[in-house]
Amino acid sequence: MLPVAGSDVTVWSPQGRIHQIEYAMEAVKQGSATVGLKSKTHAVLVALKRAQSELAAHQKKILYVDNHIGISIAGLTADARLLCNFMRQECLDSRFVFDRPLPVSRLVSLIGSKTQIPTQRYGRRPYGVGLLIAGYDDMGPHIFQTCPSANYFDCKAMSIGARSQSARNYLERHMTEFTDCNLNELVKHGLRALRETLPAEQDLTTKNVSIGIVGKDMEFTIYDDDDVAPFLEGLEERPQRKPALPADEPAEKAEEPMEH
């Protein structure tokens, strides 16, 4: 009996699709949102941390790979941990064998080759995680996106995870400003984009935000908990939906649009 399309990664559907890969792409959309963006001198990752319950600590969303590279994840954390270990090993090999840091584009190419294997072999499943890779090398700062389909993209700015379309809308509106931003302004743009993914009643705090920065003369550094506070202090308050006024009281201003 022939296997049903969608039950196995080696079986094509009549429409020319591989459903198992598409299901893995959906796993990325279930993960908490993360944002990556770059200027002429720096690349920044900003991620939203989730806690599985009130008794659990917040999960790490930004991982250190090498002095010049870090990643943020959306999707299955276990798969991300495996890929991160692979990336660390490749960076170490480059330093021991060639005595130089591994170029970011080369590392992303290796990740693409590794994640392509389970999309083609029987008995394997695609990695259910998407990565945003921030790095700095001789070519300048980089932001790359990788997908469970083994595709990867060089980006000026990108967001993946749950409700990430709202963040991408913000990034598209302000993309022309990123190139000449100083580091603090670049981080603020990342935080504003990440805040767009939150429900109206929530806001960014030192507990649910993680920031990773790499750039010229700056090794990859992760900021968590209290270290995030200086970046959040300079961020304006999130505009809230105004409560409806009683019928006998006229509205003072109707200039600002309501939040959608």
UniProtKB/Swiss-Prot annotation:
SMART domains: Proteasome_A_N (SM00948). One of its GO terms (cellular component) is cytoplasm. InterPro entries: Ntn_hydrolases_N (IPR029055), Proteasome_alpha (IPR050115), Proteasome_alpha-type (IPR023332), Proteasome_alpha1 (IPR035144), Proteasome_asu_N (IPR000426), Proteasome_sua/b (IPR001353). Residues 231-260 are annotated as: Disordered. Coiled coil: none annotated. Keywords: Cytoplasm, Nucleus, Proteasome. Pfam families: Proteasome (PF00227), Proteasome_A_N (PF10584). Residues 250-260 have a biased composition (Basic and acidic residues). Its main location: cytoplasm. It comes from the Eukaryota. Component of the 20S core proteasome complex involved in the proteolytic degradation of most intracellular proteins. This complex plays numerous essential roles within the cell by associating with different regulatory particles. Associated with two 19S regulatory particles, forms the 26S proteasome and thus participates in the ATP-dependent degradation of ubiquitinated proteins. The 26S proteasome consists of a 20S proteasome core and two 19S regulatory subunits. The 20S proteasome core is a barrel-shaped complex made of 28 subunits that are arranged in four stacked rings. The two outer rings are each formed by seven alpha subunits, and the two inner rings are formed by seven beta subunits. The proteolytic activity is exerted by three beta-subunits PSMB5, PSMB6 and PSMB7. Belongs to the peptidase T1A family. This is Proteasome subunit alpha type-1. It comes from Gallus gallus. The gene is PSMA1.
